């Protein structure tokens, strides 16, 4: 895989089915900054026309077809996407009011031709991609209209609230009547819910319970303030097992009792919480499925906090979703979370959707879905997509009708044969035949796809999380830490910046797809687009460092860096050099500058320019953003290149770089010694093992009786997370934007340490003074299982973590944590493979050693070397363990 592609995949997340700007990005003219004349140094010397040739290779040009023949992309593995089924969760929010009537027509303009991006919603040129929906006053079903009643205050009898009776399976009475009297009774003996509240009939018969969310808020008030509730049944469902709508009133305990209750400090906020929960529940009654509730909460949260990023028409369209019927909402969410893009109605069946056909019709009318049932509605693209819905048997049957016979059982080959028939005008109308097989087909409309994708992106702020995150939370598979979301500045201050960011992610996805499809023309096009977007852009210095990753220039820089790897893989180093210089000139304060500088120096050397390579390396050491492994790499390059007559003076850092790291060599019986394959050995017990396990066996035996584990960076990031837990999740404005974060947004920036310097240093002083183990135990026991960046709960026991902290020592642990706090991004990887320790006879004091294990043909990376040198300087006991295969003895 090309360097930088894995990072790009994480940025993209789940691929979008519809890219609004795909055609415009690939067809519009883009200033070709790579269509330039280079000299032997890889420097731009003059503008060139379309026939420009690179000095490195006179046969190459910027026409992708000129160099596509020698691309070696066939070894790239295609990414597989997995689909998560939504289940349940609980996530509350107060929704916006719905607008009654609207008409929406949408279109997105190109943002290629100007610096200012103005997207408006107007009629699309393709009828199938346009939406026109009208929300009538009576669009809500009767049951939903009834559930949208507001909470009122009855001045004579007290506070009236509307809610439901649930848990009807526990009822003593099956048949209920509208107007029947009811009373509320606490049920603290309920072993499943100590806050349970029973609903009792006028004859003292059990009717069910109040919903759990309301009981949780209301039960403390009943217990502490002796509140009494009675009311009536206001609606009876068709099925006796369904929830029953009721209205209950809290009577005054005496003539002035209500005001007396309000005098207590805790009463008012608790009662307001009850009203909030009641209001939310009436918006989403018990019959609302969990994934349906989560989806609506997603919409409401984003529309509440990011309304300035949507046009009036877009907001109206999204706000119309809750007015859809229950079936329509459920069907849309189900289909949106599936791969698609097209679905056969005959294959759509969900137990919670009673009428899929009617739901689909409603969704199509309202613009959330597009459907096709007439062959005249199919163009070539839709035709290709719908053929994917046919199975192998259906494909063979259709081909046989055209007297095309194929022995292959591969679906892709059959589809290609079918499409070739469709392109041949002499054949029968395949569109009609295919639709006869598939029946009515539907897909999520492009407008809904684009807007819901934006909502998810704004809610989760990444491409790796989606609606399935609610499922993980509800099932207890993941537990998020407790923190406060303190608003400061907006991540996207205006719509223009958001649209530029979205377009950059589109370019990134196009780049990824083109690499999968071995399409060099599109690869080059994406590189050019991304390079053009950063040519006149740089990260806003006033923008918080934690928010830089949400800018278009930052995303485009990821595409450009992948382009560097692409050109390096093709040995077109002058193009890679040009792109690296563009990155270095546009991003002056970026932790990636170190890697870019190393690549620039290396590529210049590949071009036969050692003097310039040396100069770049020397200038890189003056850059404060060149750190950790990149800094060591440049120092080692300088020592290698700065030989007389290029340089006569020995660099001052030569002694530091050449600092001797202790080594030990052991032998093992090798199972394989092939280059490029991870070495396997026979362990002391005769079982196969890796090189790290073999080293652990050595240290536990003749190496000195050490205990140990194979940890790499994981144990140190875990210790850092536990020791700094309260600081990581402290109240800092702006760093927590969503409820699904495992770390503050600024963790990998300089601002993390600078903003919290006083508290960090205070905590590190405690660690250095011997309190590390105590802090570790408290964090481990109180936060166990809670997700936190870097903390690997499943890998290490508390005993192993305590041993590591106790044997390494407080001073060393504090030094390591300080480096991670100051520059987490640079130091979060590359730590030694093994941690070994042994206690002294008293059982409390001990010693530890960090070991980097290398096989015979393996060598240290620059990041690993940087860590070993840093650890030695901080007082750690470190060692390199080299494993060599033992000589084979013939018997």
From Swiss-Prot:
<dbReference type="InterPro" id="IPR014905">
    <property type="entry name" value="HIRAN"/>
</dbReference>
<feature type="binding site">
    <location>
        <position position="852"/>
    </location>
    <ligand>
        <name>Mn(2+) 1</name>
    </ligand>
</feature>
<feature type="binding site">
    <location>
        <position position="833"/>
    </location>
    <ligand>
        <name>Mn(2+) 1</name>
    </ligand>
</feature>
<feature type="binding site">
    <location>
        <position position="712"/>
    </location>
    <ligand>
        <name>Mn(2+) 2</name>
    </ligand>
</feature>
<dbReference type="Pfam" id="PF21170">
    <property type="entry name" value="FAN1_TPR"/>
</dbReference>
<dbReference type="Pfam" id="PF08797">
    <property type="entry name" value="HIRAN"/>
</dbReference>
<dbReference type="GO" id="GO:0036297">
    <property type="term" value="P:interstrand cross-link repair"/>
</dbReference>
<dbReference type="InterPro" id="IPR014883">
    <property type="entry name" value="VRR_NUC"/>
</dbReference>
<dbReference type="InterPro" id="IPR049132">
    <property type="entry name" value="FAN1-like_euk"/>
</dbReference>
<dbReference type="InterPro" id="IPR033315">
    <property type="entry name" value="Fan1-like"/>
</dbReference>
<dbReference type="GO" id="GO:0007129">
    <property type="term" value="P:homologous chromosome pairing at meiosis"/>
</dbReference>
<keyword id="KW-0479">Metal-binding</keyword>
<dbReference type="GO" id="GO:0004528">
    <property type="term" value="F:phosphodiesterase I activity"/>
</dbReference>
<dbReference type="GO" id="GO:0005634">
    <property type="term" value="C:nucleus"/>
</dbReference>
<dbReference type="Pfam" id="PF21315">
    <property type="entry name" value="FAN1_HTH"/>
</dbReference>
<keyword id="KW-0539">Nucleus</keyword>
<dbReference type="Pfam" id="PF08774">
    <property type="entry name" value="VRR_NUC"/>
</dbReference>
<dbReference type="GO" id="GO:0003676">
    <property type="term" value="F:nucleic acid binding"/>
</dbReference>
<keyword id="KW-0378">Hydrolase</keyword>
<feature type="binding site">
    <location>
        <position position="853"/>
    </location>
    <ligand>
        <name>Mn(2+) 1</name>
    </ligand>
</feature>
<dbReference type="InterPro" id="IPR049126">
    <property type="entry name" value="FAN1-like_TPR"/>
</dbReference>
<dbReference type="GO" id="GO:0016818">
    <property type="term" value="F:hydrolase activity, acting on acid anhydrides, in phosphorus-containing anhydrides"/>
</dbReference>
<dbReference type="InterPro" id="IPR049125">
    <property type="entry name" value="FAN1-like_WH"/>
</dbReference>
<comment type="function">
    <text>Nuclease required for the repair of DNA interstrand cross-links (ICLs). Acts as a 5'-3' exonuclease that anchors at a cut end of DNA and cleaves DNA successively at every third nucleotide, allowing to excise an ICL from one strand through flanking incisions. May act upstream of the helicase RECQL4A and the ATPase RAD5A, which is involved in error-free post-replicative repair. Functions independently of MUS81 pathway, but in a similar pathway with RECQ4A, RAD5A and MFH1 in ICL repair.</text>
</comment>
<protein>
    <recommendedName>
        <fullName>Fanconi-associated nuclease 1 homolog</fullName>
        <ecNumber>3.1.4.1</ecNumber>
    </recommendedName>
</protein>
<dbReference type="InterPro" id="IPR011856">
    <property type="entry name" value="tRNA_endonuc-like_dom_sf"/>
</dbReference>
<keyword id="KW-0234">DNA repair</keyword>
<keyword id="KW-0227">DNA damage</keyword>
<feature type="domain" description="VRR-NUC">
    <location>
        <begin position="770"/>
        <end position="884"/>
    </location>
</feature>
<feature type="binding site">
    <location>
        <position position="833"/>
    </location>
    <ligand>
        <name>Mn(2+) 2</name>
    </ligand>
</feature>
<keyword id="KW-0464">Manganese</keyword>
<keyword id="KW-0540">Nuclease</keyword>
<comment type="similarity">
    <text>Belongs to the FAN1 family.</text>
</comment>
<keyword id="KW-0460">Magnesium</keyword>
<dbReference type="GO" id="GO:0008270">
    <property type="term" value="F:zinc ion binding"/>
</dbReference>
């Amino acid at each position: 895989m090309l360097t930088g592609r894995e990072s790009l995949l994480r940025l993209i997340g789940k691929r979008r089915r519809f890219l609004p700007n795909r055609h415009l990005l690939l067809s519009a003219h883009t200033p070709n900054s790579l269509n330039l004349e280079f000299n032997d140094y890889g420097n731009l010397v003059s503008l060139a026309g379309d026939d420009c040739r690179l000095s490195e290779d006179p046969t190459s040009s910027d026409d992708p077809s000129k160099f596509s023949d020698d691309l070696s992309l066939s070894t790239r593995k295609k990414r597989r996407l997995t689909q998560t089924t939504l289940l349940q969760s609980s996530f509350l929010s107060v929704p916006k009011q719905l607008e009654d009537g609207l008409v929406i027509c949408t279109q997105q303009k190109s943002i290629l031709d100007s610096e200012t991006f103005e997207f408006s919603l107007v009629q699309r040129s393709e009828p199938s991609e346009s939406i026109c929906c009208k929300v009538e006053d009576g669009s809500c079903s009767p049951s939903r209209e009834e559930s949208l009643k507001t909470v009122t205050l009855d001045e004579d009898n007290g506070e009236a609230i509307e809610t439901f009776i649930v848990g009807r399976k526990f009822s003593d009475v099956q048949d209920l009547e509208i107007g029947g009297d009811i009373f509320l009774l606490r049920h603290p003996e309920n072993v499943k819910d100590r806050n349970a509240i029973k609903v009792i009939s006028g004859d003292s018969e059990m009717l069910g319970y109040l919903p759990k969310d309301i009981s949780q808020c209301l039960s403390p008030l009943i217990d502490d303030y002796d509140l009494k509730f009675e009311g009536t049944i206001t609606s009876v469902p068709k099925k006796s097992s369904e929830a029953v709508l009721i209205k209950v009133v809290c009577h005054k305990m005496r003539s002035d009792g209500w005001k007396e209750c309000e005098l207590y400090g805790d009463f008012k906020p608790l009662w307001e919480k009850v009203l909030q929960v009641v209001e939310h529940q009436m918006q989403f009654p018990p019959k609302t499925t969990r994934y349906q509730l989560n989806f609506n909460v997603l919409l409401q949260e984003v529309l509440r906090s990011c309304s300035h990023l949507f046009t009036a028409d877009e907001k109206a369209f999204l706000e119309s979703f809750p007015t859809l019927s229950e079936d329509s909402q459920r069907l849309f969410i189900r289909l949106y979370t599936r791969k698609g893009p097209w679905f056969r109605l005959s294959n759509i069946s969900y137990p919670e959707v009673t009428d899929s056909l009617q739901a689909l019709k409603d969704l199509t009318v309202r613009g959330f879905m597009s459907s096709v049932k007439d062959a005249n509605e199919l163009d070539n693209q839709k035709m290709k997509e719908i053929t994917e819905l046919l199975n192998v048997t259906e494909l063979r049957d259709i081909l046989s009708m055209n007297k095309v016979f194929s022995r292959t059982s591969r679906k892709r080959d059959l589809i290609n044969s079918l499409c070739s028939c469709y392109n041949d005008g002499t054949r029968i109308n395949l569109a009609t035949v295919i639709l006869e097989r598939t029946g009515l087909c539907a897909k999520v409309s492009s407008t809904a796809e684009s807007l819901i994708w934006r909502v998810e992106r704004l809610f989760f702020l990444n491409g790796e999380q989606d609606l399935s995150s609610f499922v993980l939370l509800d099932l207890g598979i993941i537990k998020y830490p407790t923190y406060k979301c303190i608003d400061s500045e907006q991540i996207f201050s205006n719509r223009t910046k958001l649209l530029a960011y979205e377009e950059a992610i589109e370019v990134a996805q196009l780049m990824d797809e083109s690499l999968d499809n071995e399409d060099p023309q599109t690869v080059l096009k994406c590189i050019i687009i991304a390079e053009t977007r950063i040519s006149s852009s740089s990260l806003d210095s006033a923008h918080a460092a934690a928010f830089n990753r949400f800018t278009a220039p930052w995303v485009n820089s990821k595409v450009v860096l992948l382009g560097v790897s692409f050109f390096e893989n093709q040995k077109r180093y002058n193009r890679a050099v040009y792109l690296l210089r563009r990155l270095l000139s546009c991003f002056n304060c970026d932790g990636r500058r170190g890697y870019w500088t190393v690549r620039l120096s290396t590529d210049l050397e590949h071009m036969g320019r050692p003097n310039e390579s040396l100069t770049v390396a020397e200038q890189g050491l003056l850059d404060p953003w060149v750190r950790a492994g990149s800094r060591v790499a440049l120092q080692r390059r300088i020592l290698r290149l700065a030989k007389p007559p290029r340089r006569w003076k020995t660099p001052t850092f030569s002694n530091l770089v050449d600092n001797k790291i202790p080594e030990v060599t052991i032998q093992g019986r090798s199972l394989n010694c092939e280059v490029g394959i991870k070495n396997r050995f026979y362990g002391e017990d005769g079982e196969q093992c890796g090189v790290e396990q073999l080293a652990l066996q050595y240290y536990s035996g003749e190496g000195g009786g050490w205990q140990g584990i194979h940890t790499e960076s994981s144990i140190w990031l875990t210790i850092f997370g536990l020791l700094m837990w309260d600081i990581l999740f402290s109240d800092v404005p702006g760093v927590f934007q969503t409820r699904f974060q495992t770390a503050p947004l600024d963790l990998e920036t300089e601002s993390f340490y600078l903003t919290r310097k006083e508290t960090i240093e205070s905590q590190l002083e405690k660690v250095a003074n011997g309190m590390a183990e105590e802090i570790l135990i408290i964090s481990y026991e109180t936060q166990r299982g809670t997700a936190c960046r870097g903390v690997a709960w499943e890998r290490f026991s508390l005993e192993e973590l305590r041993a590591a902290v106790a044997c390494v020592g407080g001073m060393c642990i504090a030094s390591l944590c300080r480096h991670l706090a100051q520059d987490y991004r640079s130091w979060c990887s590359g730590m030694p493979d093994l941690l070994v320790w042994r206690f002294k006879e008293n059982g409390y004091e001990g010693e530890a050693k960090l070991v980097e294990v290398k096989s015979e043909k393996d060598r240290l990376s620059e990041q690993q070397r940087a860590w070993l040198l840093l650890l030695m300087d901080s007082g750690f006991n470190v060692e390199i363990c080299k494993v060599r295969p033992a000589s084979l003895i013939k018997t």
